[in-house]
Amino acid sequence: MPRKGYIGKRDVLPDPMYNSKVLTKLINSLMYDGKKGLAQKICYDAFDVIQNKTGKEPMEVFEEAMNNVMPLLEVKARRIGGATYQVPLEVRPERRQTLGIRWILIAARKRGEKYMSERLAGELMDAANNLGAAVKKREETHKMAEANKAFAHYRY
């Protein structure tokens, strides 16, 4: 532990093309082996595909997709008296964003299209329309929280 007090979170710089911090986080999560240029190319190509297929502003589609994927509730295991309970909790805003990005990328990587840019574009368009694996993951998480509402009084 540091002796000089709390070290704050590092703030990411907004991406150069759309001036969005959330998009930078998506690009950073998409990146493998430090190849940020490649991750940016994939992301911007995906945005071009969205622009061509929907005719809408890609940033609007991305924001809509994020809103549809970010979870409000999640369950966390809590051990009480030898039994483990799944306790529903509200998700902090930062974690909501992180989970949304993570689920979109996982769902995109599992898709069948040939190129990652097409997969990402497809998943973002599906998520914007409340379809796709990422939205399904959010619904599952909410269902789990709803099913375990009886244990809400065990909150942290």
Swiss-Prot record:
For this UniProt record, the keywords arranged alphabetically read as follows: Ribonucleoprotein, Ribosomal protein, RNA-binding, rRNA-binding, tRNA-binding
What does the record give under GO molecular function? rRNA binding; structural constituent of ribosome; tRNA binding
A single GO BP term for this record reads: translation
Which stretches are annotated as coiled coil? none
Say if the entry is tagged with keyword Heme: no
| Domain of life per record | Bacteria
Q: Name one GO cellular component term.
A: small ribosomal subunit
The cross-references to InterPro entries, in alphabetical order and at most eight, read:
Ribosomal_uS7, Ribosomal_uS7_bac/org-type, Ribosomal_uS7_CS, Ribosomal_uS7_dom, Ribosomal_uS7_dom_sf
Q: Which Pfam families match?
A: Ribosomal_S7 (PF00177)
Q: How does it assemble?
A: Part of the 30S ribosomal subunit. Contacts proteins S9 and S11.
The UniProt entry's sequence similarity note says: Belongs to the universal ribosomal protein uS7 family.
Chain's role: One of the primary rRNA binding proteins, it binds directly to 16S rRNA where it nucleates assembly of the head domain of the 30S subunit. Is located at the subunit interface close to the decoding center, probably blocks exit of the E-site tRNA.
Please state what the protein is called: Small ribosomal subunit protein uS7
